[in-house]
Regions:
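Conserved catalytic submotifs in the C-terminal HATPase_c
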Residues: 6-16
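Conserved micro-motifs of the catalytic ATP-binding
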Residues: 17-20, 93
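A residue-level detector for a conserved hydrophobic packing site
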Residues: 25-26
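ATP-lid-like helix-loop hinge signature
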Residues: 36-62
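Short conserved segment of the HATPase_c
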Residues: 76-89
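Short alpha-helical Gxxx[C/S/T] motif in the catalytic ATP-binding
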Residues: 101, 105
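Detector for a conserved hydrophobic position within an alpha-helical segment of the HATPase_c
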Residues: 109-110
Length: 133
């Protein structure tokens, strides 16, 4: 873990419950946060002095749970034309990646009655997951 990255967590409820396979969803969240950390580390190879940050937001309302992970890493630079390609198996931007991580994340989210969206932002990336209750 990179101790120089600020991780900010915001939630609108102390108790958010979802009927799920907790092991599978834990892997989803771990994979997405790990990707954010790696993206920030990759950016820091070229830009030495920036405020490294990951923001995690978890919100619940009557019919859905929304998770948003935002980072200020390199973003989806290789997927500007078609952001959905980020979900294709064996597509990777990492030196040692397999390209399976996000396709597995997508399948797991879909299996849990959810939808994932990858949103390019000016300085980084945003991932939004909505689980229907």
């Amino acid at each position: 873990l990179d101790n120089s990255i600020d991780i900010i967590f915001n939630k609108n409820s102390d108790k958010i419950l979802i009927e799920s396979d907790k092991e599978q969803l834990s892997r989803v969240f771990l994979n997405l946060i790990k990707n954010s950390i790696e993206s920030i580390q990759q950016k820091s190879e070229n830009i030495s002095n920036f405020n490294k940050k990951i923001t995690i937001e978890l919100h619940q309302n009557n019919n859905q749970i929304t998770l948003i992970i935002t980072d200020n890493g390199i973003g989806f630079v290789n997927f500007n034309e078609n952001i959905r390609n980020v979900l294709n198996p064996y597509i990777t931007t990492k030196k040692s990646g397999t390209g399976l991580g996000l396709s597995i994340v997508n399948k797991t989210v879909n299996d849990h009655n959810g939808k994932i969206e990858f949103i390019p932002i000016k300085d980084g990336a945003k991932i939004k997951i909505i689980f229907l209750k």
